[in-house]
Structure formats: C-alpha cells, structure tokens
From Swiss-Prot:
The keyword tRNA-binding does not apply. The gene is eEF1delta. GO terms for molecular function: guanyl-nucleotide exchange factor activity; translation elongation factor activity. This is Probable elongation factor 1-delta. EF-1 is composed of 4 subunits: alpha, beta, delta, and gamma. GO terms for biological process: translational elongation.
Amino acid sequence: MKVEALDKFWADKSRYDLAEKRFYEGPQKVTDRSHYSPLVSEIAKAREHIQNSLEKIDGVTLDDGLNSELAKRLAQLEGEHKELKTQVSLLNELLTATVKRLETQLKLTNGVSKEPEVEAKKPEANDDDDDVDLFGSDSEEEDGEAARIREERLAAYAAKKAKKVQIIAKSNIILDVKPWDDETDLKVMETEIRKITQDGLLWGASKFVPVAFGIQKLSISCVVEDDKVSIDWLTEEIEKLEDFVQSVDIAAFNKI
C-alpha cells in the first residue's frame, strides 16, 4: 500500500498551477494597459486620419474654395500667356520693319552710281575700203560737242568756286608792353607802336595799366590774319623800339 501511494504522487503540480495562472492573467493585463497608455490611442487616431486622407485622395475630392482658387490662377496664367504672345508678335514686326529699312538704306547708299562716261565710238578701219573713214565727219562733230560740254562744265565749276566765300582765319591778341622806367612817355610809345603796319594787321583799343612804384605798362589789342601776320614778327617789330620798350608779353590770344 505504501508503494502505490508513492507512485501516484504529483511532484510538479505547483509549476503547472503557476503556468495556468499566467495564461489566464496575461490577456487581462494587456487590455488594462491599453486603457492607460495615451500613445496607443494617438497611434490609432493617426491611423484613422491617414486612412481618411487616402480615401479622399483616391476619390479626388476637393473643396469648392480650392477649386475656385485654381480656376482663378489658371485664368490669370492664360491671360499673361496671351499678353506675352502679343508683345512677342509686336517685337517681331518691329524687328522686321527695322531690318527692311536698313536694307533699303544700304541699297540706296550702294546704288549711287556715277555719271556714265560717254565714250565716243571709233569707227573700225576696213581694209577693203582702202583706209577711207566714211564716218569721219560724224566723229569730229561728236568730239567737238564733247569738248564744248566739258568746257562749259569747267567754266561753271570755276564760277561756282569763285562765288564761294572763303573763311579767313583771324586772331584777337592783347599785348602787354612794358617801358624801361616811369620816365618813359607811354603816349609816344603807343604812337610808335601803331606806326607798325602790315596787310592783315589791325590795331585796336589800348589802356595804361599800373605795375608798381609808379610805373605803368601799355596794354594794347590788335586783330591779325593768321595767314598774313606772324605773332613772332609782330613782337620783334615792337621790341625794335628800344628807346621805349623793355619787353613785350602776350596777355591774351583768342581765335576769331
């Protein structure tokens, strides 16, 4: 009897009881933890929102406000496109007209031809006519007519050139003439200077200008023709008046 009782003894019962307890308590703990975890609820909301967004995109559902905004934008882009096409067309027309105008001007510039030179035809000598020039009288008349026309043109050109007014280059000069001392008579010195004459020289106004220590200088103006009177010659002529003149300076020089 004792041996049978020992054979029926379950030594691992406690381990099986613990496993059974864990099996039944596991789902309950997971359910309770979901109630108290905010992260799980946020994930569920995010999944729901993503699912709704995907359904809207698949169905191409847009709001009325968005549709009207897109329509306005498309209309604005179409208007700008038409305006750009119009401006490009106008620019092309303007460019074409400019090119045509330039081509016309180039043709006119390059198309100016000189007067054709009329060459008198010389009759060819015919050996069969024994060197008889049958058109000799006509050629002589043509040569005489050409010579007359040439003479008339030369005469007309000469007359036109003679009538043309030639521009004479002139200069207005102011000279400062300094005497030796205060005892020099400036009036006499001026008289002697004005005695210098030359074709193309015209004396002008004059005045006495104080220098220092009671000494004065003569400032006199004159107009000279550049082709006829040299400035160096004029100053040398004035300096030849050694009894009165110490030096001559050019105070002003202007072209007329």
